[in-house]
């Protein structure tokens, strides 16, 4: 349709290719010159390239090193301490926080400059570097090695089109290269070139087998030049092997594992040496459409169990909901029957010439038909009726009528139903009739299933509160009291009214929450029974509900539907309902891969999604021409009325192919369809292979798919099975017509259909493809019904007859286009929500990484201290409450403020803030000195004792009487800084521990917020805008809480006192026991409890693995028993150091409130 535009302005893709072909020619010129070099001379080219890159960025890196050294040598605001506890000067120049920030900004600008210079340099090196790779491939011809479990003989030298694709990949674009065109080899050239920067690059694949196979297959090419290559999927998380894989010049891995490692690094790692990844420099994503489009709506989530979470609601409601669904089925059958009867009466009225009565009867029949489709759209009797001439048009006409004027007539349609189903939007909503029915079944009040209008209730109690306040003011005016007493009484009485108001509000919210949970559970169960089918959306294996990926047909291991849907499916299938989980960390693949400095990808089908790639990822798609012309015969679709007719036709066609020995691959959209066709072929005695989610085995799958091109082979596979594996055919099969592809239905996305078609006709081989479609297929039923119904009616199609018509093919394409646009809109909307979380994630992960590595961490504690003091003073100053301020400072920061009311008023609010801050920092400096000096002395003694056998790290246990944490200090750093390293370690650990705890809670709050935010649209508010505002408020509160808790912990915490220094030979320390813990803030010489074991009892990787719920759980450590309720214990007041004895039941309350610790 747009050919005349292309003729006028030129094809933009051709224009891009025309720019690149001269570069390909230049590469080939270099290639000819390189053939005379020896192997060592060829290898030397790599060293020369690296040297050129180093030279180009030498000045930039020198300045960056200067900045690093300057920041490192600058003394801290707290200052290291000498042996006498006094602050000493370091060798470097002192820097203010503003000066530090300026240096950090300069460093960031230099980093951007580094990227630009390197890109320019790589572009200059590209022709010769790519030629080096091509020459290396030529020299490898005939060599053999193992790859993917099989011995392979190297027989590839890049074609010009592969070099063209490689240039596109280096430019940070998407190369669309058809199946069999050698994408794997094309990626080698840009990976080699970008690895020369020394910052590593990654190739991301879709499954473990391909990641490991491609590492082994392409590895010798890189290794010829001394580059290291590894695969992350070979190793378990948090292991040295996986860390080394990321340290390699070129790293292969799956999108899931690489994404999860990012989350692990930012969630469970507590020491810099435990970090796996080293940055996001350059990545090529293989099958990029699968990763960034198909999986875009499914975030990577690391989750753990929710404590004390019960799932009884789903069990209790399952049977009542199943009865409700059965009642709806009966109702829908009655609507179908009524429709037929009304249409028969209509025919009689028409025969009698009563056109008005006939129209009324048709309208009534349309309403019954529409109600049936709203009540249970997948009902078989309904589907059979809709396939009859004129029925789909009648349903569509009725739907259009009731959807007019913002669907104001829809309540009339749904009032006769127990619940309404919107299959397109995948929603189910219970009606008033349904609420009455389920309340009757459960013998409960109907009100328990109706959500109160919270806004109205809140407004009502707030009005009542305001009336009481007004009455209070009037009553006080009449009392004979002084102005001061009147104001005090007013404030006290008003405070009581406020408490009463808050309690009433809390009751309203609790009532809403309880009912909302129940209604939500019912709606999720209704979805499970009506919209989700076993062996289509999910399978049940080994007593578990497992999700089937609609795009690949594979089981999505470890994934669960959110918002209670998975629990509802487990209840429906009567398997064990797994405990609900809470999110510890999550990221969408969209946002993860947008972090890379440069990103590119390759696939056989990207052009149809070019708009989305450009809009969301800023990635252009370049279609690379094939090495040989495509000879595959893509036949028109065959359309049948019913699925049964379609499946029978597919089996007959398979028999026809099989009889003459031509291999055939049948693509299916679900497990159920693949097994239906398989059973029929078994009855016909035709041997075949089946690949679906129930046989999820990537390596065997790839082998079966690879053999699908052999003579007489019949393979049934769900969508995308074996993607990334070529189906090669023999000369004998070529003579038979090549591989035949039969699609059992059209997918929602044209791209998935093109991928299936692309399995045949690789590298100019013959082949053919054809899709079999029925009007009962979901795509046709939901999105192509109106136009198809008109065509059917006009053609008078009989049952069993194949439908072929240009309009049908256009309708299919139009239906697919509708779904693609809808899915794109959903992904964009999802991204709007996730962008909110992503911006918060970036802040929190940056703060966590800075605490972990010490980079830019200096001064954060004092910044948080100042903000916390500001908040405290603001809270108390307006009320003149100096006593409250002193109490809060003593409780949270463990020091007493000496200030009288006169000074409090005279200084003003800002003055009080500055004064309190000065007092706090003086106290904190002294506390740090009191901790550092004895720690330094202990280490010196230990070093003298051990000599050359001195360990690298020590572990010190701290407690504030309530929380216990373990700080890890570097011995050399501690000795160099006179023990100050232990204070830095305490701050780092406090920050990490608090961030992890608060971030997990914050994610749960965001999940809860997101669940109900869509309802805001009924109040004519944009849910995304509302989500952004409330999420920001929650995030601000969280950041304030993190600051307060970190400051409080580092101010109050002291080292655990012990009589012995534990060394390596004594084995790991027991877990901290608060029964034996003791804090000491002001002792000049506390006896340190140091664990000098080289790995702290758990190993560097083991410590992170223990925190990570995705790693197999280790045996827990036993903790000492808690004292009996009436057992007497000794506790210490942390503010003044005094000890006292009391019963544990009283002591426990004091310790939990803070400021007290258990001594014995």
Curated annotation (Swiss-Prot):
Q: Look up the EC number in the record and give it.
A: 7.4.2.8
Write out the annotated subcellular location.
Cell inner membrane; Cytoplasm
Report the superkingdom from the record.
Answer: Bacteria
**For ATP, which residues are the binding ones?**
162, 180-184, 726
Which parts of this chain are annotated as the region Disordered? Answer: 342-362, 1060-1134
Report the top EC class in one word. Answer: translocase
Q: Give the record's membrane topology.
A: Peripheral membrane protein
Keywords attached to this entry:
ATP-binding, Cell inner membrane, Cell membrane, Cytoplasm, Membrane, Nucleotide-binding, Protein transport, Translocase, Translocation, Transport
- CDD domains per the record? DEXDc_SecA, SF2_C_secA
Residue stretches of biased makeup (Basic and acidic residues) = 1104-1115
Bias (Polar residues) ranges: 1074-1083
The Gene Ontology biological process annotation of the record reads: intracellular protein transmembrane transport; protein import; protein targeting; protein transport by the Sec complex
Q: What GO molecular function annotation could you give as one example from this UniProt entry?
A: ATP binding
Primary subcellular site in the record, as a coarse category: membrane
Give each disulfide bond as a residue pair: none
Catalyzed reactions per annotation:
ATP + H2O + cellular proteinSide 1 = ADP + phosphate + cellular proteinSide 2
Q: Which PROSITE patterns match?
A: SECA_MOTOR_DEAD
Q: Where is the composition biased (Acidic residues)?
A: 344-353
Tell me a GO cellular component: plasma membrane
Subunit architecture: Monomer and homodimer. Part of the essential Sec protein translocation apparatus which comprises SecA, SecYEG and auxiliary proteins SecDF. Other proteins may also be involved.
- Into which family does the record put it? Belongs to the SecA family.
**Family matches, as NCBIfam families:** PRK12901.1 (NF009536)
Functional description taken from the UniProt entry: Part of the Sec protein translocase complex. Interacts with the SecYEG preprotein conducting channel. Has a central role in coupling the hydrolysis of ATP to the transfer of proteins into and across the cell membrane, serving as an ATP-driven molecular motor driving the stepwise translocation of polypeptide chains across the membrane.
- Stated name of the protein: Protein translocase subunit SecA
> Which organism is this protein's natural source?
Salinibacter ruber (strain DSM 13855 / M31)
Query: Coding gene?
Result: secA
């Amino acid at each position: 349709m747009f050919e005349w535009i292309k003729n006028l302005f030129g094809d933009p893709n051709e224009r891009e290719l025309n720019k690149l072909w001269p570069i390909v020619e230049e590469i080939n010129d270099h290639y000819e010159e390189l053939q005379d070099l020896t192997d060592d001379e060829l290898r030397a080219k790599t060293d020369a390239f690296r040297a050129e890159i180093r030279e180009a960025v030498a000045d930039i890196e020198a300045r960056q090193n200067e900045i690093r050294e300057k920041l490192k040598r600058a003394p801290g605001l707290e200052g290291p301490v000498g042996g006498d506890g006094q602050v000493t000067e370091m060798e470097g120049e002192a820097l203010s926080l503003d000066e530090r920030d300026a240096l950090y900004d300069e460093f960031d600008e230099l980093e951007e400059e580094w990227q630009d210079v390197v890109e320019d340099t790589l572009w200059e090196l590209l022709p010769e570097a790519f030629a080096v790779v091509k020459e290396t491939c030529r020299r490898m011809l005939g060599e053999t090695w193992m790859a993917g479990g099989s011995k392979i003989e190297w027989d590839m030298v890049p074609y010009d089109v592969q070099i063209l694709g490689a240039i596109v990949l280096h430019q940070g674009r998407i190369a669309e290269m058809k199946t069999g065109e050698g994408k794997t080899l094309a990626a080698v050239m840009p990976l080699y070139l970008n690895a020369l920067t020394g910052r590593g690059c990654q190739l991301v694949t879709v499954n473990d087998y391909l990641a490991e196979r491609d590492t082994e297959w392409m590895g010798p090419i890189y290794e010829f030049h001394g580059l290291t290559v590894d695969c992350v999927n070979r190793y378990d998380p948090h292991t040295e092997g996986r860390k080394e894989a990321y340290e390699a010049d070129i790293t292969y891995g799956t999108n899931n594992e690489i994404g999860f490692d990012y989350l692990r690094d930012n969630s469970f790692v507590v020491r810099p040496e435990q970090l796996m990844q080293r940055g996001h420099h350059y990545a090529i994503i293989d099958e990029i459409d699968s990763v960034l489009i198909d999986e875009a709506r499914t975030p990577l989530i690391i989750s753990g169990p929710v404590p004390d979470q019960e799932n009884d609601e789903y069990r209790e409601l399952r049977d009542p909901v199943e009865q409700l669904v059965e009642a709806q089925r009966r109702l829908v059958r009655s609507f179908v029957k009524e429709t037929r009867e009304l249409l028969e009466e209509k025919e009689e009225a028409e025969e009698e010439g009563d056109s008005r009565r006939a129209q009324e009867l048709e309208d009534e029949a349309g309403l019954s038909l529409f109600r049936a489709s709203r009540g249970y759209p997948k009902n078989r009797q309904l589907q059979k009726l809709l396939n009859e001439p004129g029925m789909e048009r009648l349903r569509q006409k009725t739907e259009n009528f009731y959807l007019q004027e913002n669907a104001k007539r829809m309540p009339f349609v749904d009032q006769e139903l127990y619940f309404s189903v919107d299959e397109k939007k995948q929603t189910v909503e219970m009606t008033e009739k349904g609420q009455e029915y389920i309340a009757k079944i459960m013998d409960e009040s109907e009100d328990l299933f109706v959500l109160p209008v919270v806004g109205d209730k809140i407004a009502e109690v707030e009005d009542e509160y305001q009336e009481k306040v007004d009455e209070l003011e009037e009553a006080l005016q009449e009392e004979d009291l002084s102005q001061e007493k009147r104001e005090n009484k007013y404030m006290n009485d008003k405070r009581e009214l406020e408490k009463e108001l808050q309690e009433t509000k809390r009751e309203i919210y609790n009532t809403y929450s309880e009912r909302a949970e129940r209604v939500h559970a019912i709606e999720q169960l209704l979805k499970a029974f009506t919209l989700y089918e076993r062996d289509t959306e999910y399978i049940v294996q080994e007593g578990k509900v497992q999700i089937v990926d609609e795009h690949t047909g594979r089981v999505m291991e470890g994934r669960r539907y959110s918002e209670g849907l998975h629990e509802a499916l487990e209840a429906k299938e009567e398997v064990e309902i797994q405990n609900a989980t809470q999110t510890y960390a999550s990221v969408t693949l969209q946002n993860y891969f947008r972090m890379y400095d440069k990103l590119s990808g390759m696939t056989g089908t990207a052009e149809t999604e070019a708009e989305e790639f450009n809009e969301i990822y800023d990635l252009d798609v370049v279609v690379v021409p094939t090495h040989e012309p495509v000879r595959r015969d893509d036949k028109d679709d065959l359309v049948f009325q019913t699925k049964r007719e379609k499946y029978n036709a597919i089996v007959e066609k398979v028999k026809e192919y099989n009889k003459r020995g031509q291999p055939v691959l049948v693509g299916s959209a679900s497990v159920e369809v693949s097994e239906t066709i398989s059973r029929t072929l078994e009855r016909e005695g035709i041997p075949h292979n089946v690949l679906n989610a129930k046989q999820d085995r990537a390596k065997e799958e790839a082998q079966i798919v690879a053999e699908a091109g052999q003579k007489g082979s019949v393979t049934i596979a769900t969508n995308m099975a074996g993607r990334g594996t070529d189906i090669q055919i023999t000369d004998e099969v070529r003579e038979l017509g090549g591989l035949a592809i039969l699609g059992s239905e059209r997918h929602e996305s044209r791209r998935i259909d093109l991928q299936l078609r692309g399995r045949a006709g690789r590298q100019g081989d013959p082949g053919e493809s054809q899709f079999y479609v029925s009007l009962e297929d979901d795509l046709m039923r939901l999105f192509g019904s109106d136009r198809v119904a008109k065509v059917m009616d006009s053609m008078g199609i009989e049952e069993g007859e194949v439908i072929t018509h240009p309009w049908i093919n256009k309708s299919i394409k139009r239906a697919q286009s509708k779904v693609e646009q809808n899915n794109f809109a959903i992904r964009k909307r999802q991204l709007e929500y996730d962008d909110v979380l992503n911006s918060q994630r970036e802040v929190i992960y940056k703060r966590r990484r800075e605490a972990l590595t010490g980079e830019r961490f200096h001064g954060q504690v004092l910044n948080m201290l100042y903000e916390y003091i500001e908040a405290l003073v603001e809270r108390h100053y307006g009320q003149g409450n100096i006593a409250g301020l002193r109490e809060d400072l003593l409780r949270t920061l463990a020091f007493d403020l000496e200030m009288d009311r006169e000074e409090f008023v005279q200084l003003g609010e800002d003055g009080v803030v500055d004064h309190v801050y000065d007092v706090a920092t003086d106290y904190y400096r002294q506390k740090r000195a009191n901790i550092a000096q004895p720690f330094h002395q202990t280490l010196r003694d230990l070093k003298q004792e051990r000599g050359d056998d001195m360990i690298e790290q020590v572990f010190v246990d701290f407690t504030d009487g309530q929380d216990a944490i373990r700080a890890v200090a570097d011995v050399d750093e501690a000795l160099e800084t006179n023990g100050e390293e232990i204070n830095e370690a305490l701050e780092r650990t406090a920050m990490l521990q608090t961030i992890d705890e608060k971030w997990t809670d914050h994610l749960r709050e965001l999940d809860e917020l997101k669940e109900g935010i869509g309802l805001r649209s009924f109040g004519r508010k944009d849910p995304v805008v509302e989500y952004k505002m409330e999420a920001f408020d929650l995030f601000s509160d969280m950041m304030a809480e993190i600051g307060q808790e970190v400051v409080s912990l580092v101010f109050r915490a002291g080292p655990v006192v012990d009589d012995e220094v534990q060394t390596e030979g004594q084995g790991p320390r027991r877990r901290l026991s608060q029964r034996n813990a003791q804090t000491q803030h002001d002792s000049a010489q506390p006896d340190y409890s140091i664990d000098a074991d080289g790995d702290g009892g758990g190993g560097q990787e083991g410590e992170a693995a223990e925190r990570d719920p995705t790693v197999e759980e280790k045996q827990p450590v036993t903790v000492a028993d808690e004292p009996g309720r009436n057992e007497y214990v000794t506790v210490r007041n942390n503010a003044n150091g005094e000890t006292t004895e009391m019963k544990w039941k009283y002591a426990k309350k004091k310790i939990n409130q803070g400021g007290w610790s258990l001594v014995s």
